[in-house]
Amino acid sequence: MPNYRGGRINEEFKREISNIIQNEIKDPRLTAMISVTDVKVTKDLRYAKVYVSIFSTKEEEKKDNFTALKSASGFIRKILGQRINVRHNPEILFELDDSINYAMHIDELIQKVKDK
């Protein structure tokens, strides 16, 4: 049963963090589309590792957006504490998730093989 609770907490944090990034943060450096792909909260609720995909063709823009997200982690943590009632408000650690880009690359390779 604790695994089920952990999954619910992860999904709730994922939904709220996505909402905060899309609607609450007013940082002009956030120019690309950002998607929260996964959230892993530790069992003691001290840390939340947030995996994000940043959709941009420019590598420099991705870095700027990721830096802006990292600098907004305190603000996101504060808003999460107001919205979600848990014992400890977790420290947010952002991780860049390139699995979507990798999947698109693999799909392109498969298409090239099919075309030959």
Swiss-Prot record:
Pfam families named among the record's database cross-references: RBFA
An annotated GO cellular component: cytosol
Keyword Ribosomal protein attached: no
Cystine crosslinks: none
Alphabetical list of SUPFAM superfamilies matching this protein: Ribosome-binding factor A, RbfA
GO biological process, one term: maturation of SSU-rRNA
GO terms for MF: ribosomal small subunit binding
Entry keyword Ion transport: no
Primary residence: cytoplasm
Keywords: Cytoplasm, Ribosome biogenesis
Subcellular location field: Cytoplasm
PANTHER family per UniProt: RIBOSOME-BINDING FACTOR A, CHLOROPLASTIC-RELATED (PTHR33515:SF1)
Subunit-level organization: Monomer. Binds 30S ribosomal subunits, but not 50S ribosomal subunits or 70S ribosomes.
Function: One of several proteins that assist in the late maturation steps of the functional core of the 30S ribosomal subunit. Associates with free 30S ribosomal subunits (but not with 30S subunits that are part of 70S ribosomes or polysomes). Required for efficient processing of 16S rRNA. May interact with the 5'-terminal helix region of 16S rRNA.
Family according to the record: Belongs to the RbfA family.
Protein name as it appears in the record: Ribosome-binding factor A
Lineage of the organism: Bacteria, Bacillati, Bacillota, Clostridia, Eubacteriales
